[in-house]
Amino acid sequence: MRIQIEKDQLGWVAGLLDSCGNIMFSKTHVSGNIEIKLKLTDYECLENMKTKYGGAVKVSRTGTRYRLNHSEGLKKLLEDINGQIRIPVRVKKVKEVCEKNNIEIKYPDKELSLDTAWLSGFFDGVGSIVINQTTLENKKQLVLTFNQKNNQILIKIQRIVGGNFYINTNTQSGKYKYALYFTSKEEILQLYEYFKKYPSRAYKNKRIGLIPQYYELQTLMTSIHDNQLQETLWKKFMIQWDYKEIDEIQSGEILKQKGVIR
């Protein structure tokens, strides 16, 4: 379903570009070329970008790519995100492309805020929401995560919404990857309230919408002592939750029928 990007949601565009966007220059596109890559299931999400700014959406079996390089749409997008880009490497690139398009660069406030849609767009690019099966009392743990190669922006996110850090080190390259993750019910519900105001536009929004139902089911389980009934209730819930394999296959089939991929 196509959802119009309203003025108060423009921070989402900046957050998405910060998380998984790329700004390039070439001989054929001297004014700049913006590219954003998402999963196959997020085809409609990038079609929303195309509707607002023009450009093109290309789908392959591995994902969906949005590319914008025509002058009018590029300038409109730059005006919308100007002053909201936060990742240093992106700020540098936006400064370059603004200069080439005669746009005065603006810089964001030092501290992040929950009063913009930036965090929603950033989550759509690098976030995940899963239920992990733990060995402790066979518990099913809801986990919401932001992943990044650099921890600077994650520290700023932690200041406003909490969470805990996990550092993954690649033993071969010695490089670090950082994850800011949330398991606390209070913190996750705070994020849920934020997403109600500034919705995720990626397919993972389906899971975000199920957060209250997850906690209701967790509470219900404490009063049910029939293991078979518990298993039945969880299976029914997980049919709604586990869209990944089923819906990625279905999305692929639908896009084939539309002639988007072959």
UniProtKB/Swiss-Prot annotation:
Its EC number is 3.1.-.-. It is an enzyme of class 3 (hydrolase). Coiled coil: none annotated. One of its GO terms (cellular component) is mitochondrion. It is found in: Mitochondrion. GO terms for molecular function: DNA endonuclease activity. The keyword Cell inner membrane does not apply. The keyword Nuclease applies. It holds the Pfam family LAGLIDADG_1. Gene3D superfamilies: Homing endonucleases. Keywords: Endonuclease, Hydrolase, Intron homing, Mitochondrion, Nuclease. InterPro entries: Homing_endonucl (IPR027434), LAGLIDADG_dom (IPR004860). Its main location: mitochondrion. One of its GO terms (biological process) is intron homing. Belongs to the LAGLIDADG endonuclease family. Mitochondrial DNA endonuclease involved in intron homing. This is Intron-encoded DNA endonuclease ai2b. It comes from Dictyostelium discoideum (Social amoeba). The gene is ai2b.
